[in-house]
């Protein structure tokens, strides 16, 4: 089942550390249970956002790649 995000954060063209900072700010705005889709093309974004999600104890729902773009879906759990 495909999860429809509540918000999408477009980080295409942004490089470290901007995708992580912007993801953190967006997660702070979400309500528990909502999902955030992050789109990025920085090669470091996937691992950086994964680390952020783990450190914030949120749920990494899925990670997908299409060409140079990574799509990361995060659910706020607390």
Regions of interest found by a model, annotated:
Residues 1-6, 77-78:
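Compositionally biased, disordered extreme N-termini, encompassing classical targeting presequences
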Residues 2, 14, 29, 63-65:
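Sterically constrained small-residue positions within well-ordered secondary structures
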Residues 4, 33, 67-69:
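A general secondary-structure signal for short beta-strands and their flanking turns/coil
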Residues 4-12, 37:
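Short amphipathic
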Residues 17-61:
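Amphipathic, hydrophobic secondary-structure cores in small proteins
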Residues 50-78:
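C-terminal structural segments of small proteins and small subunits
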